[in-house]
Amino acid sequence: VGRIGSFGRATVALLLALLALGATAAPAGAAPKVLVVGDSLEELTSPYLSRYLPGAELVINAVGGSNSYQIFDLFQESYEPSDSVIVFDAGTNDNPEYPQILAGNLAKVAAAVGNRCMVVPTIHGFTVNGVDNTGKNRAVAEFAASRPGTQVPDWAGTVESSPQLLQSDGLHPIPEGAELRAQLIAQGVEGCLAYEQARTTAPAQPRTNVEPIATVGRLQARQAAVMGELQTDLLRQAAVLLAGSLLGR
């Protein structure tokens, strides 16, 4: 009985080894890291973000009164290569007569983060010397058009249609407005994460003059041959164990 038990345990071990050859371990997915930088609007918005992004690791660096130059500095202070999404909530305190300031700072962030996805809300700010925020929002739209995947939560359009979401100063949101703004930004973050998932899992485009089907076929044949060799070796070991078990009776 002892010899049979020993052989049984060896056989089970070999079978488990065979099964393990075809198994792949999927690492547990880490929570996506989201960096959020901004001004006083973001200070009011950010307390609600975790409610709508419960699975994300949020890093928030927002300082009231900051223009886009200063918010770029906040970005530089906080950015890590492990960040998955960058929310650049800037432009409200920029002079609307010079939309190129925001455009330049957006370009600097993009240069620093590579192909990481960005969320850039549209801007509702004060009119200065008769100039409104059209130029700044055009800069945001042009930036998004030049960079696939960029998400643009429409805060400007939201408060234009629902001005009751703003405080009496006509600039900062009331609590209900701040929560809605957080929802818009969270939707942008989710859009970024979905875009990144689609981008990283999309099949590579075949190169010119390459026969991808034949290449895949040869690879599969080689993998099958290697698997067969390994399985044959393991079965040979099982046969040796069986022979030893029988001879030892």
What are the residue ranges of the model-derived segments?
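Bacterial Sec-dependent signal peptides at the C-terminal "C-region" and cleavage site
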Residues: 22-30
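Alpha/beta-hydrolase-fold catalytic nucleophile elbow
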Residues: 89, 121-122
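Generic structural signal for well-ordered alpha-helices
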Residues: 103-110, 137, 141
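Bacterial N-terminal signal peptides that target proteins for export
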Residues: 1-12
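Bacterial N-terminal signal peptides
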Residues: 11-23
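A short helix->loop->beta-strand "cap" motif at the edges of active sites that frequently abuts
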Residues: 114-118
